[in-house]
Every structure is written in C-alpha cells, then in structure tokens.
A protein has these predicted regions:
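C-terminal structured domains
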Residues: 390-398
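Short, structured beta-strand/loop micro-motifs enriched in basic residues and often containing a Trp
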Residues: 326, 381-391
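Electropositive polyanion-binding surfaces
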Residues: 1-380, 400-426
C-alpha cells in the first residue's frame, strides 16, 4: 500500500486485474515485477517496509490482545516448504540454523493450538489432494502428480487465518472501509438434497444439524471411515456457497469465523491491498480528532464506492481460477496428442448426470468423459446414491470403477479430448 497509491496508474491496472494469475509454467502478477518480485518481496538480510499484525494468544490459541502497526523487517533466511516440512515431520537436518530450528518448533506448537481451536469451533477441514503438472528438464509436461497439504503449508495457513480474522475484527470494530471475505451458509434447497444423499451413507438427518459448520465437521468425520469418502467430500463441497468479497462483514461459514477478511496477500490480491490502505489511513490519522458524524458520512460514501469493486474482485477471482484450469487442460491436450490410438486403463474419480471424471494411468491425468461414450448401455445418474445405473443391463457404476478407454481425438485449440469406450476392467 505504501508503493501503490490510490488512483495511480499502477493502482488502476491492479484494480483491473484484481488478482495475480498462476499458470503451470509462469505467473501474471497483479503488480509490476519491480514490486511483486522486488521492493515488496522478502529477501534475506534486506530491510522491507511491512504492516504488522502482532497477536498475543493464550494457551487455547485464542487471541487475547493484538497490535497493528507499520514496521520494518529483515528476513534472516529464505526457507522452502519442502525443507521445513522435512524438518518438522522427521527431524531431518534440512534446516541447519539452530535458532531457526527453535523458531520452527515453536511455530509448529502454535500451529497445533490454532488447529485445535478451529476444530473445536467447527471449522470444516476437507482433505483434498492438489494436482500439479510435472515437467522434465526441457520444461515439457511428463504427467500429473497429486499431493496433500504438507505440515509447513498447514502452519502458514493457520497463521494467515488468524491474522485475517484479527484484522477483520479490528476493521469492524473501527468501522474501517474495507472489503470482507464472506462465506454464507448453504441454501435450504441444497441442504435438503444433501440430507437425502447422506441418509444413504448412515447419516441420520434428524440427529445431525447442518445449520452450522460444526454439524458439517461432524458429518465429515463420520464419512472418513467410508470407501466413498473422496466422492462424499465433493458432494459436501458442492452443497456450499462460493466465498465472495463484500463491503460488510458476514462471517465465514466454512471457517466457523464470525469475522473474516483477506489481509495477508496485498501483492497478489486487490482486496488485501484495500484492507492495508484502510489500516494505514487509520494509523496515520489516529492522533487527529474527527467528529463521529464526519467519520460516519465518509464510511457510507466508501461503502457505495466499494460495493461495485467487491463484485468485480469476486468476478476476477473466478476468471483467474478458470484461466488456470484452462491452461492445465491445454497442457493435457498437448501431452496426450502424440498418444492418439493408445488404450488407457482408467479409474472413475467422480460422476454426475452428464459425465464421468476419469484418471488416466499411469499419468495421474484427469479428464471429463461424456456419459454417451459409455455405449454398452444407457446410464442414468442416481443423485442420492451417487452411482450410474444401466437401463438395459442394470449395471451399477460407482466411483472407483476401472475401465479401458482408447484415445481417438485431440483438439488442442478447442482443449477437447475424445475417447472410445473399450470395456470395464472389474
């Protein structure tokens, strides 16, 4: 916020972009390279201007006091997630500095406190793996890989969540003109359908409440023991609303948080930059006396300006996500084009009324295949039981079913791949 002044050329371009976009091979930053990888990027031994949210937590991980202030910090080391995870998980000497080791152990202890606090509160903790494109030394795609969130990533996530909640609470208390990250509860219609589905998997909708995130968390814990857990996670996720930016705090259902905003990434998200501006403006005017009337008028005016911007930031976030997914699909097409005519053993990862999503072995590459491709029968999707049912033969197709597909066509420009169905494998 110190370098990106309101209404400057850099600010207008950042507002237009709304967010940085991350492709498998490169990123398109929201801010110019000189800022995103230069003046605003931490480097060991170099002073950097920062905005600090310093929190005091009790033994239960609850924030009992905090202070937000402008600061100057000097990073002691550049650490990477894998090295820190190796040290935290197995005690490997991937981190040689003893002082840093001591700090990481303390941070790990704090992470567990924060995790337990959010668990008690009812925060919903999905367990999805994240797919990433693998490359060779010539930057050519060799396949896909799946990884679950590492301990080091979980640690940073918990710290960011705590900072975001604390700053959101502060902005509401001080009536600052900021954007909030709001996640509404699921709609009644989606809850009704979800209850019907869960009833087939041993969850009695009459004994478990879905009116709050704590109920969702309890259900998720129950479903972990089932072989269909991965698919049921998707069902739960799809029943929930999308998180959006708004000018008023509305809480975050998934995190079971009463207050929530985005504060921790002002380099790559415009809403975070706006929050930083509001905080810096408050800090600079803290010693200036202003009438409550003037402050209230200014706040109302700010809300009128920001409401349209909040909608735009939400839309730009969706656009970035869509672009990232399409870029991965494009790379999959380029990768598979030389394999036209090849048979692939595949496994169904998810399904719905229009298509099955299969994972092609051995590349861990997923693609959507239309139901019409399964030409041995005419299949219908049972939304409550989560399987496909063949009208003529009565075959039931569930997630985890293996099949053989032949790659017959790849259109790189249209990002489209077609298969022929060769038969079921089990």
């Amino acid at each position: 916020a110190h370098y990106v002044r309101p209404d400057s050329a850099i600010d207008e371009e950042a507002k237009k972009r709304g967010t940085s976009v991350y492709f498998p091979t490169h990123a398109i930053p929201m801010l110019p390279e000189a800022l995103s990888n230069g003046l605003c990027s931490l480097r060991p031994g170099v002073n950097r201007l920062t905005l600090t949210c310093e929190m005091q937590l009790n033994q239960d991980g609850e924030c009992i006091d905090y202070r937000i202030y402008e600061s100057l910090i000097k990073s002691h080391a550049r650490l990477d997630y894998d090295a820190v995870a190796d040290f935290l998980d197995s005690g490997k000497n991937s981190i040689s500095n003893k002082e840093i080791q001591k700090s990481l152990k303390l941070m790990q202890e704090l992470m567990h406190l924060l995790e337990e606090k959010r668990k008690r509160r009812g925060a919903i903790q999905f367990e999805f793996s994240e797919s990433s494109v693998e490359f060779d030394h010539q930057n050519r795609m060799t396949g896909m890989s799946k990884k679950f969130q590492s301990s080091s990533m979980k640690m940073i996530e918990q710290f960011m969540l705590e900072a975001n909640e604390t700053v959101a609470r502060h902005c509401v208390k001080r009536k600052l003109p900021a954007l909030y990250r709001v996640h509404q509860p699921p709609s009644d219609l989606k809850l009704q359908q979800l209850k019907k589905t869960l009833a087939h998997y041993g969850v009695n909708p009459k004994t478990v409440s879905l009116s709050d995130s704590y109920g969702f968390s309890r259900i998720l814990s129950h479903l972990k023991e089932l072989p269909q857990f991965e698919a049921l996670q998707v069902v739960l996720l799809r029943s929930m609303a999308l998180a959006v930016y708004q000018t008023r705090n509305g809480g975050h259902f998934g995190l079971a948080a009463e207050f929530y905003t985005h504060f921790t990434s002002p380099i790559r998200r415009y809403p975070d930059l706006m929050v930083h501006r509001a905080l810096k403006k408050e800090l600079s005017s803290r010693n200036q006396k202003k009438s409550s009337r003037k402050r209230n008028i200014k706040q109302k005016h700010g809300e009128e300006i920001d409401r349209e911007l909040a909608l735009k930031c939400s839309q730009q976030e969706r656009n970035a996500e869509k672009a990232e997914l399409q870029s991965v699909d494009l790379m999959k097409c380029v990768f598979l084009e030389p394999h036209i005519g090849v048979d692939f053993q595949s496994i169904i990862r998810s399904l719905d009324s229009r298509q099955i999503r299969v994972e092609l072995e051995p590349h861990t590459l997923e693609w959507n295949v239309p139901l019409e491709t399964l030409n041995d029968d005419r299949y219908f999707f049972d939304q409550e039981r989560l399987y496909l049912s063949g009208r003529r033969q009565g075959r039931l197709i569930r997630i985890g079913q293996r099949l053989k597909l032949k790659l017959i066509r790849v259109d790189v420009l249209q990002r489209n791949i077609d298969f022929d169905f060769e038969g079921w494998l089990n």
